[in-house]
Amino acid sequence: DAQKDAAISGWSMSGYDPKNWKPASQIELASTAFLDKNLDYGQLKITGQLDDRVQVRKVLQAQSIQEPRKGVFIYDMGQNMVGFPKIFIPNGKAGQVITLRYAELLYPDLAEYASQKGMIMLENFRAALAQDIYVLKGGDEYIQPRFTFHGYRYLEITGLAQAPALAQVAGIVLSSISEISSSYDTSDPMVNKLWNNITWSMRGNFLSIPTDTPARNERMGWSGDINV
């Protein structure tokens, strides 16, 4: 909710008055299936996580847009990517709710999917809720999700009366891999394309640690079978 920005404006500056802040509530630490005893906070220690940092590696521009249903705007980023969007909203209305959904595929143009023609397909994401909800603060602003990532090619935007222009929609590609230390080149364009696809996919699956998939509901560390 970007409307809350004003409430913390200047919070990092000396002289800021936090009189309207509410103290945090302490939540009891209950046992879980992985830990069969209760703990208190005095037994816990915060330690820094040592890993390769996730950085912006590339910025993709939206290639096309379609409106399969009124008010449903679907952007094609041109290829599958891992990261998040950056969307410029000019003259936004304060309190307006924008919903972003992500997909790797569109429904195929087949009779059994006639009612979903042109819409994003989410079945392959299984239980993953690939969605961000943003509340505008008003005026010109950028929508750029934080503390998350998505694996997608297609971006669905709803909640706007008019579709943002292609130049206003970008895809921020993330990875912990800064460079590929090997190369592979053959006389066969298809083999070269396969190599490029493999390295692109590997980049998208290294976010601090190797992961099993950036899209569906796994999104976990992948340290076992990757080494086989």
What would you call each of these model-derived segments?
Residues 1-217, 221-225:
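Extracellular/oxidizing-compartment recognition motifs
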